[in-house]
Regions:
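Short amphipathic alpha-helix with an adjacent loop that forms part of the alpha/beta core around
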Residues: 59-61, 115-121, 189
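Short glycine-rich phosphate-binding loop at a beta-alpha junction
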Residues: 63-74
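Short secondary-structure boundary/capping segments
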Residues: 16, 24, 118-120, 184
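Short, well-ordered alpha-helices that flank and scaffold nucleotide-derived cofactor binding pockets
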Residues: 57, 83, 87, 145, ...
Length: 213
């Protein structure tokens, strides 16, 4: 972890928790006082299943999901979520009893695209946007814009951690939120109080992880 000030936020599930470090962290467009490490939730099957089980409860009874659009390396969680939403023990809203799991290509920091062979999995489909976190919301906003551009309908937004319950006019459902991390702060990179106090940045962070400075 990027700092020694780390802790785990536990849930009722023994294999589902949030590992965080407190410090001064920078992304490409914001600064925060916590680094939230979700590497194991994204990569370890048992934890990805636990995340999927939690998120499934928001959509299994009343939401049609044809496609799960995975951002930030969430393909393992997305596959587990698709499996849960189409399993026999849940009431399934999907007419075809199956779900596409796709990822977009990034043109630049604010635009996403789908190749011609992927477009049919978006166009005319109910698309659930799945992200690691929703903090500034820029990546999710780009995903929502892309889904609409390619003729899809946004079915909802889901994430492991979110600081807001709404983004681009859609409800955000998450496993963890500020109630689990009440002193979490996210600032614009040019208006960061930690920078103004002269506090050094501990690490650069993005959806892939961290790099200590």
């Amino acid at each position: 972890m990027p700092t020694s000030n780390t802790m785990k936020i536990k849930t009722k599930r023994p294999n589902l928790y949030l590992r965080v470090s407190k410090g001064h962290f920078a992304t490409s467009n914001s600064h925060s006082n916590y680094y939230i490490d979700v590497a194991t939730q994204k990569s370890r099957l048992s934890e990805a299943k636990a995340v999927a089980d939690e998120l499934c409860n928001y959509y299994r009874h009343n939401t049609i999901v044809d496609t799960i659009l995975c951002l930030d390396g969430m393909e393992v969680v997305g596959t587990c979520l698709a499996d849960r939403l189409t399993s026999g023990d849940y009431v399934n809203m999907n007419a075809h009893q199956t779900i596409y799991v796709v990822t977009p290509e990034s043109v630049n920091s604010s635009q996403l695209l789908f190749r011609d062979n992927i477009v049919p999995m978006i166009q005319g489909k109910h698309v659930l946007v799945l992200a690691v976190s929703v903090a500034t919301g820029r990546t999710v906003e780009a995903a929502v814009e892309a889904v609409k551009y390619y003729g899809g309908e946004v079915a909802g937004i889901a994430s492991i951690f979110a600081t807001s319950h709404e983004c681009s006019g859609y409800t955000v459902n998450s496993v963890f939120d500020p109630n689990d991390l009440p002193d979490y702060k996210n600032y614009s990179s040019n208006d960061c109080p930690m920078c103004k106090k002269g506090e050094k940045i501990d690490a650069l962070i993005n959806c892939h992880g961290f790099s200590k400075l």
